[in-house]
């Protein structure tokens, strides 16, 4: 059994909530910023790269917006802004790319 451990380089982030997918995670800061880390396959991290990220990295495509919620699926991530906009990035279960409102992958 694994024991709990701190996510690397997350100490400076005031975390409001977290969501975990099959091989990636997303967190929402109290300032409304979205951070993702883990397996980047299928664009699920929203950083425009397929490289694994070992520590939370801010999703720059959402800069200037305040997110209110974040959620992870197996191959996708979603965020809802405080003004009700929905952003989804990654891959649908059919392995088709998913882009709602704005491309982040």
Region roles according to the model:
Residues 1-105:
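Eukaryote-biased RCC1-like beta-propeller repeat architecture
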